[in-house]
Amino acid sequence: YEKNPAKYVMAPANAIKRHVVVEKRFSDMAAWADSCPFNKTEYHDTKLGIICAGSTYVYSKEVFGDNASYLKIGLVNPLPDNLIRDFCSKVERVIVVEELDPIIETHVKAMGIKCDGKNLLPVLSEFSQEIIAKCVNGTEPKFVSLDEDIPVRPPVMCPGCPHRGLFFVLKKLGVTVSGDIGCYTLGSAPPLCAVDSTLCMGASISGLHGMNKCGGIDPKKSVAVIGDSTFAHSGVTGLMNMVYNKAVSTVIISDNSITGMTGHQQNPTTGKTLKGETTYQIKIEKICEAFGIKDVKIIDPNEIKLLEAGIKDSLGRDEVSVIIARRPCVLLKEVKKDKYFTVNSDKCRKCGACMKIGCPAISMTENGAVIDETLCTGCELCEKMCAFGCMEVKSR
């Protein structure tokens, strides 16, 4: 490394000079794009030419085969202008097959080349062979059909997930929930349906702050829900601003002791590095106290009565409150799963209370509720839901 402030310190005077370098570099790349090995042409039938990139090349090949010629673009920025002109001059009709926004199509048309694209193909969702064949040819491709329909598998929180009890209580209380990115985003799905908004990482707290200041939503009937790793990633500054700007709402930090959704990565609150080495553990409660938050509670979210009482207490305060709903992710290897529950069918009254938590291990039959013991983790939440003592614990 060599010190070069003129290159690396982007103060206005330096930025103006570096802008010239960037534009020259981009111009050089544009000239190279025409000979770039990532851009390939395949000529077959020249009545139709397909311009595509990525997976749409494979789909198009399966639909049109040798009945079309192809320009597969591997370098999409900058686009290979001369290669595009040369390809289009050798085919009678051009169709740009690209997913979502018509980036390549708009560029081709700006070059004065007539082509089809989004006038035939949808601007939404990802493509498939069926979509391309139907939109361009008006035909359905031939596929091997399955004798049985594949069952629907909607995304769902795992059996024993510590977020489940929290969202059950929030739904029961009827509060507005500003959500965030993580496993707990699934709190928006049936039967819980507790999350009202989710935008991006950290937006739960900032969004709640905005609700406080803009009005229209009672701050004492609204909460933010954010995970421990997301809080460390981009929630800390939002909470600090809530305190600074005298907001009045409750922030719930759902601490499952890991970064769950993306594959159990460590984070600053777990006490381990990404390599698994022991390191200093950032205490969420200490951060909250350092901001001057007086009401900081730590509650096990599976203790739904305590959690409900704690949320009600925090919502009644004229200040920022924090509840840390702390229970480790059930998929952590150190979490014991040495028991499971069954349903005593003689006691079951088919009231459906156990179904309200949305546990995938529980289903309802003509004879009452049934628990799949291979899925049950013994979290006890269903036992707390049942008013008739139907749930019976078994050892593994």
List the model feature ranges, each with a label.
Residues 1-157, 162-166, 175, 179, ...:
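Flexible, low-complexity linker and terminal segments
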Residues 89, 109, 171, 243, ...:
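Anion (oxyanion) recognition and catalysis
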Residues 188-324, 334-335:
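Thiamine diphosphate
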